A protein has these predicted regions:
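N-terminal topogenic module of multi-pass integral membrane proteins
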Residues: 1-61
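A glycine-rich, hydrophobic loop/mini-helix early in the fold
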Residues: 46-100
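Interfacial loop-to-helix junctions that mark the boundaries of transmembrane helices
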Residues: 1, 27-36, 66-71, 91-95, ...
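C-terminal ends of transmembrane helices
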Residues: 20-25, 49-62, 107-117, 160-172, ...
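Membrane-interface helix caps and helix-loop-helix hairpins in membrane proteins
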Residues: 91-92, 113-120, 138-143
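C-terminal transmembrane helix-loop-helix hairpin of multi-pass membrane proteins
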Residues: 1-13, 30-39, 125-126, 133-210
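Cytoplasmic-side transmembrane-helix entry/capping segments in multi-pass membrane proteins
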Residues: 35-38, 63-73, 96-101, 119-130, ...
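Alpha-helical transmembrane segments and their membrane-interface exit regions
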Residues: 43-48, 103-111, 130-133, 152-162
Length: 210
């Protein structure tokens, strides 16, 4: 039920951005063709069906508990990073700005992530999206779209997933012993945070929020 609600909420948010003109404006500013957009979303959707197991995490406290298997979902984690490389060809924010804002988003996302015995790591998007959007507009008003995307994706990946991996060992009662980074596919926080950060930044820019 929660998954369907998240899907509907995501569609509603994108519909709002479309109504405000933010989605169209982002596509135009990044000079993304309809063909490139279709290919990108196709890769993300197909990648969501593919998971690659990396290694296992043994519980340090309960040796009798089966290890938690850790993997990556290609659509939810790898494809957003490929998008990042593509976007860098459209705009080129300064690398130091990327590092600074990524560190900020990581610091915001980390405490807003909780461990769930059923689903593993649950990340709340609001902090990543808003901090990346506002930070990008302040640091680089020219290349704010790609800066917001980069910081949101990397900050969510690091603060929401990677830094919480040690805590997975403590979830001895998890019903699902396999956890995928980016496991939500196109509905995963890593994938959505970057897209929403760009559109939020564009909305703030149009409103002359800063």
């Amino acid at each position: 039920m929660a998954r369907y609600f998240n899907a509907l909420a995501t569609l509603a948010i994108f519909a709002i951005f479309l109504k405000l003109g933010s989605l169209t404006s982002v596509i135009n500013k990044l000079q993304i063709s309809q063909q490139e957009l279709a290919v990108g979303m196709g890769l993300a959707t197909l990648g969501s069906l593919l998971g690659l197991q990396l290694f296992s995490l043994e519980s340090t406290e309960h040796r009798h508990i089966p290890p938690i298997k850790l993997g990556v979902n290609l659509g939810g984690s790898v494809v957003p990073l490929l998008f990042l490389l593509f976007f860098f060809n459209q705009q080129s924010p300064q690398i130091q700005h990327v590092f600074i804002l990524t560190a900020l988003v990581t610091a915001v996302v980390y405490p807003m992530t909780r461990m769930d015995r059923q689903r593993g790591m649950v990340i709340y998007l609001f902090g990543a999206v808003v901090s990346a959007a506002l930070g990008a507009l302040m640091l680089d008003p020219k290349n704010y779209l790609v800066l917001a995307y980069s910081a949101a994706v990397l900050g969510t990946l690091i603060g929401g997933d990677l830094l919480h991996l040690p805590q997975l060992k403590k979830l001895t009662e998890m019903s699902n012993r396999t956890v995928f980074i980016g496991g939500g596919g196109v509905l995963d926080a890593i994938f959505l945070s970057g897209l929403m950060a760009m559109m939020t930044a564009e909305t703030f820019q149009q409103m002359q929020f800063l």
